[in-house]
């Protein structure tokens, strides 16, 4: 959970006094560009330090947990780094080593995830030959290598075609049991079918936190579909 979580960049407040509690489930993070979604995710991943406030996991500050907290995380930033001359399989093996997986587990998990994101046939191809959607699918796979208890995905469906987005939704639905999954997107349909809760942000603040039915009921009679 977050307590009074605030992040400022100079005079600009990117995240403004957030107080939220998350339990196991899928959370969709919605908001316009500049709403504070990416900054919030980076704070939750302990990549950036808050200006004030705290983030707690089981009542313990994540700053004090250090590596123990990071071992529980899977993260896909909007633009993830990769070595263009690595094959998809070699890249996942490399990231597996960084995450501390042993040889046997790394091989097994890499193969499983390449299958899950439909890249098995391209596993030996160099990443520089991949389309944007293929790279994004590889990014989703690397975030899941360590079987994280907390999975944070920033714009995970960017570059995916409709068929790939359906596969992604099915993958997250299957993976989310007994885990916290947070994904930000501009594509409402990506979270409409899999998110138990929607977090809507504007100007660094949460303007709505609830299930999709609650959101639609609030605007009932104000929106018409043609």
Regions found by a protein language model. Name each.
Residues 93, 97, 104-122:
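Conserved ABC ATPase "signature" region
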Residues 126-130:
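Conserved ABC ATPase signature
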Residues 151-154:
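Catalytic Walker B motif of ABC-type/P-loop ATPase nucleotide-binding domains
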Residues 168-226:
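ABC transporter nucleotide-binding domain
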């Amino acid at each position: 959970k977050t307590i009074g979580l605030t992040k400022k960049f100079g005079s600009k407040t990117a995240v403004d006094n957030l107080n939220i509690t998350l339990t196991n489930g899928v959370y969709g993070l919605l908001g316009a560009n500049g709403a504070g979604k990416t900054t919030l995710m980076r704070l939750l991943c302990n990549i950036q330090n808050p200006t004030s406030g705290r983030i707690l996991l089981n009542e313990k500050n994540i700053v004090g947990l250090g590596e123990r907290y990071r071992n529980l995380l899977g993260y896909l930033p909007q633009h993830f780094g990769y070595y263009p001359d690595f094959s998809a399989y070699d890249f996942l093996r490399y990231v597996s080593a960084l995450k501390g997986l042993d040889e046997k587990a790394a091989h097994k998990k890499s193969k499983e995830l390449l299958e899950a994101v439909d890249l098995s046939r391209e596993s030996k191809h160099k990443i520089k030959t991949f389309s944007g959607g293929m790279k994004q699918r590889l990014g989703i796979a690397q975030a899941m290598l360590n079987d994280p208890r907390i999975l944070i995905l920033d714009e995970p469906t960017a570059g995916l075609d409709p068929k790939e987005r359906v596969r992604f939704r099915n993958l997250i639905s299957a993976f989310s049991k007994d885990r916290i999954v947070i994904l930000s997107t501009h594509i409402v349909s990506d979270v409409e079918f899999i998110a138990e809760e929607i977090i809507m942000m504007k100007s660094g603040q949460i303007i709505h936190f609830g299930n999709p039915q609650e959101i639609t009921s609030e605007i009932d009679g104000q929106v018409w579909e043609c």
